[in-house]
Amino acid sequence: MNPKRSFQALILTLHNYWADKGCAVLQPYDMEVGAGTFHPATTLRALGPKPWKAAYVQPSRRPSDGRYGENPNRLQHYYQYQVILKPNPSNLQELYLGSLKAIGLDPLLHDVRFVEDDWESPTLGAWGLGWECWCDGMEVSQFTYFQQVCGIECSPVAGELTYGLERLAMYVQGVDNVYDLNFNGREGEEKISYGDVFLQAEQEYSRHNFEFADTSMLHRHFIDAEKECLALLAAGAPGDNDNQRLHKCVFPAYDQCIKASHIFNLLNARGVISVTERERYIARVRDLAKACGEAFLLTDAGGLNWNRAA
């Protein structure tokens, strides 16, 4: 399949490229997240000493970015391609440029530039040194060296690559409207466009995000998710008689943190959160993320026993 002819071929090409580089090609996380970084394969696995390589597509939702399907390049639901490499390889930029070449953007034939743009996620308590990648004057992706995640220092530093798949596909296919993207690589009656797949959903979710979402219920759900996250962390905490001192309920707790984050984004889209309240909500989600990150370090995946074995 030609990555210049279909959205799905672009994804498959990136899958094959990063699989050849040793990454575990994972599936999207089955929850509403604001970015690929929220996937536990990045947020949690970036912590601790254990090496980790993964790549995946992540459907991402940013309710406030909806435009009822009327904007050609702004969406409330879109796709990111995420790569996480820990420890970050010395040739990360070279690997990234190789991936561009694989999808048909030869750096020798295009004006590829890296523009310094440090990255931050306040709700995840995460930040890193980063660069946007611009190709012929348009941003197509970003790479970041994580310094902190969940308010915890990353040691070793992990390298993260994030591709905006719709924007990248629009560039390689040469179209100006995201809904005109060829999705399946066929032409004529067999052609399926991005709009065929997603336009109606984009229109309906814009109505939901801006007009219909029940704000009273969302406020209650936020509190419920916050309480459940903390309760699960407390229930799974290692006891005094646990010889391994392992935490036993990190991932279910982190799911509740993700839920709280998405609910906050919906409340923000509905316009019912003041500037002061917004900062408080962000701090509450960040506290949950920090607690989940600290608990993850008390697990095998977080490197507790791996450290001991070393």
Swiss-Prot record:
The keyword ATP-binding applies. PROSITE patterns: AA_TRNA_LIGASE_II_GLYAB (PS50861). One of its GO terms (molecular function) is ATP binding. Gene3D superfamilies: Bira Bifunctional Protein, Domain 2 (3.30.930.10), Class II aaRS and biotin synthetases, domain 2 (1.20.58.180). It catalyses: tRNA(Gly) + glycine + ATP = glycyl-tRNA(Gly) + AMP + diphosphate. The keyword Protein biosynthesis applies. CDD domains: GlyRS_alpha_core. Keywords: Aminoacyl-tRNA synthetase, ATP-binding, Cytoplasm, Ligase, Nucleotide-binding, Protein biosynthesis. Its EC number is 6.1.1.14. GO terms for cellular component: cytosol. It is found in: Cytoplasm. Its main location: cytoplasm. GO terms for biological process: glycyl-tRNA aminoacylation. Signal peptide: none annotated. Tetramer of two alpha and two beta subunits. Belongs to the class-II aminoacyl-tRNA synthetase family. NCBIfam families: glyQ, PRK09348.1. This is Glycine--tRNA ligase alpha subunit. It comes from Agrobacterium fabrum (strain C58 / ATCC 33970) (Agrobacterium tumefaciens (strain C58)). The lineage of its organism: Bacteria, Pseudomonadati, Pseudomonadota, Alphaproteobacteria, Hyphomicrobiales. The gene is glyQ.
